[in-house]
Structure formats: C-alpha cells, structure tokens
Amino acid sequence: MSSQCGSADVTAPKPKGLFNYFSSALWDYNVALVQMLALCPALAVTTTATNGLGMGLATTLVLMITNAIISALRHSISPAVRNPLMIGIIAGVVTLIDMAINAWMHELYKVLGLFIALIVTNCAVLGRAESFCSRNPVLPSILDGRRAWASGFTWVLVVIGGIREILGQRARCSPRPRLLLGEHFRWLEITVLPGFQGILLAILPPGAFIVLGFVLAFKRVVDRRRAERRIRTHGELVVLQ
C-alpha cells in the first residue's frame, strides 16, 4: 500500500506560482476527483454537507499535524523504516483527533464513527507525507497540508454531501449545523425547495455513487471546455503573430 500511496501524488506536475498551486490542488489534480483517492469517506459519510465538512476538517487537522511531525523528523528517519514510521505517526495523530471529536463533538462523532479511524488508510495523507513533507521544512509542510490538498478534498465532500442532502432530506440544507457549531446555530437550517419530499435514493449508498458520477462528469465537461478555449485562444494568438 505504501508504494502505491507514495506514487499517487507523483503524477501531478509541480505548479508555478501561488494561483497555479491552488488551482492544481483544488481542481486540476484534486485528490478525490482526479487521483480518485479517499473515496470511502467521500461516499460513506457524505449524507449531509455537515458530515462532509466535519470529515474534511478532521482530515485537514491530521494532514497539518502529521506533516509537521514528519517534516521535523525528516533528517532523523532512516529510509529503511520511513514508511512504517510515517504510518505509525499518522495512526497516532488520527487516534488523538478521534478522541478529541468524541469528547467535544460527540454528536458528530456518532455520525462519522468508524470513518475517522479510516483516515489512517487514506493514501492521500501518506502519499503527501512521503512526497513532500519528508523533503521540505516544517512551515511549508504545514501550509501544504492546510492550504490546498486538504481543502480540495474537503470541498468535494461538502459538495457531494450538500447535493445528497438537498435531494434526499426534504431539500433541507444543513439540518444539523449544531453538530459542528452548537445549538445556537440551528437557524442555519434552510429549506431550499419548500414542499419537496426528497428522493430516498440520494441518501442511500447507490445515491452516493450516482452523485459522485455526476460531479466527475461535470468536472470533465468543464475541463474539456477550458481546453477548447485555450486551443482557440492559442490559435488566435498564432494568427495574430
């Protein structure tokens, strides 16, 4: 697994510039939509946007902490034991995050349940730790985990969860904001389509695959149109020259 996870991030070329860095991680080489990693939580916990956001934030915290630890120890880790040690560090951090959510956000913990522990097997976490954090200083490693790669995974979870929530739960957007923000934020509940009874399939496992398929198809269409626009623009520039 470690060799596959380590090579999962190699296919993305190094972007030049801050905007291209964000664009690459959030869209062009998105962890879930392009590299097709971490699909288990993307399909299992995204029955609501709140669940997707909670899982995304938990993954972001794991990435930030593990990136910092692995980067700080990068000169002390022998290549022979690097992968097992990184997996152990990731497992320890995930355990701490799991216990923290259970203690302070128990309602959210009851929803996410086992899937928090499965962050350990997330190839995106191990692959990023091996390809970037083991070769770079602490601060860039922390920012790398927080800024784009985890954000790209989080927005996919929120979008899939939001679509399934609107279609399957009587078009109510974030019916349980209290899971993340507390009882005082119940007012965030919004009814998007009054009178809509919801589609049961959307909140069932097959619905997760269907929604993911539509999101992937939408991305392919956008990418194709962007490519066609670049080709037309390049052709016009050649003609003008």
From Swiss-Prot:
User: Which terms are listed as keywords in the entry?
Assistant: Cell inner membrane, Cell membrane, Electron transport, Membrane, Translocase, Transmembrane, Transmembrane helix, Transport
Q: GO terms for biological process?
A: electron transport chain
- Give the matching InterPro entries: NqrDE/RnfAE, RnfE
Top EC class per UniProt?
A: translocase
Membrane topology, record value: Multi-pass membrane protein
The record's Gene Ontology cellular component field reads: plasma membrane
Q: Does the keyword Ribonucleoprotein apply?
A: no
Q: Where in the cell is it found?
A: Cell inner membrane
**Where do transmembrane segments lie in this chain?**
25-45, 53-73, 85-105, 107-127, 148-168, 198-218
What EC number(s) does its UniProt record assign? Answer: 7.-.-.-
HAMAP family registered for this protein in UniProt: RsxE_RnfE
So what does this one do?
Part of a membrane-bound complex that couples electron transfer with translocation of ions across the membrane.
Under NCBIfam families, the record lists: PRK12405.1, rnfE
Subunit: The complex is composed of six subunits: RnfA, RnfB, RnfC, RnfD, RnfE and RnfG.
Which family does this protein fall into? Belongs to the NqrDE/RnfAE family.
Instruction: Quote the protein name from its UniProt record.
Output: Ion-translocating oxidoreductase complex subunit E
Task: Please tell me the species this chain comes from.
Answer: Stutzerimonas stutzeri (Pseudomonas stutzeri)
Q: Which gene encodes it?
A: rnfE
